């Protein structure tokens, strides 16, 4: 697979994640806690998608690395908010199992990509 098609595939994947989170949030009971945490979750997940797009359009390796750091940070924050929702018994894990798995995979892939980019820039 070429780098361009991989980037396109991952852009779509991060966007689908953000959309899945928005749809999940819209189906949850709107308590104050869910509203507050849900909005944070939407912000972090849409930031993953938006910043990955920026990674693909970076003008230099430095810029690509900086944006990739943001993607990893925001994806990790997305994981955090999902954990908070489940561990505080606001939603059941079954409601977001697929989303949690997808976020975990994105964190792993982006962290690996970040380390490879960092390693290549120091050689």
Listing of model-derived features with the role each one plays in the protein:
Residues 1-123:
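Amphipathic alpha-helical assembly/interaction segments
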């Amino acid at each position: 697979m070429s780098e361009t098609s991989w980037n396109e595939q991952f852009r779509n994947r991060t966007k689908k994640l953000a959309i899945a989170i928005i749809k999940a949030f819209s189906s949850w009971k709107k308590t104050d806690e869910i509203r507050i945490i849900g909005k944070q979750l939407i912000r972090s997940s849409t930031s993953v998608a938006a910043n990955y797009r920026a990674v693909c359009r970076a003008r230099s390796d430095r810029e690509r690395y900086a944006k990739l750091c943001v993607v990893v940070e925001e994806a990790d924050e997305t994981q955090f908010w999902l954990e908070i929702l489940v561990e505080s018994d606001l939603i059941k894990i079954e409601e977001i199992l697929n989303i949690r798995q997808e976020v975990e995979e994105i964190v792993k892939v982006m962290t690996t990509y970040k380390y490879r980019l960092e390693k290549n820039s120091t050689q």
